[in-house]
A protein has these predicted regions:
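Long terminal segments
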Residues: 2-47, 53-55, 61-64, 70-72, ...
Length: 134
């Protein structure tokens, strides 16, 4: 479940209407795809979750696992704040400690600025969810 949530958050940053929506690891291996309807698939195209336009994040069985609010606040399924996504791509936990960064070019970095992945065709906010649901 932890791995699913991590990947789901990472994928959630994808734009639902982009044509090439993918998540890659630091070595550029594809680890996930996001379809135009918000379905999230792993590298083997198995459905692992869903992201809805309203910010609701669900697992493969449509159980809600979290929420991305319009102001960048991230909540778990129990509506507890687990973090914040800043407009500049800085990702913070609920205590405002920096967890990582999502750059405008799609590079995803940890708190020490090490590259941990790449996103293509995915909104920064959705990619940042990786830090909260892993």
């Amino acid at each position: 479940m932890r791995r699913f949530l991590t990947l789901l958050l990472f994928l959630a940053l994808s734009a639902v209407d982009a044509s090439a929506q993918m998540v890659q690891d630091a070595s550029y291996r594809i680890v996930a795809h996001i379809k135009s309807d918000g379905t999230i698939q792993d590298a083997s195209y198995r459905v692992i979750g869903h992201i809805n336009p309203n910010g609701t994040i669900q697992d493969a069985s449509y159980r809600t696992v979290g929420f991305l609010k319009r102001d960048g606040t991230v909540e778990d399924a129990s509506y507890r704040i687990v973090g914040h996504i800043k407009p500049d791509g800085v990702i913070q936990d609920s205590s405002y400690r920096i967890l990582g960064h999502v750059k405008t070019d799609g590079t995803v970095q940890d708190a020490s600025y090490r590259v941990i992945g790449h996103v293509k065709g995915i909104p920064m906010e959705w990619a940042a969810l990786y830090f909260f649901f892993r």
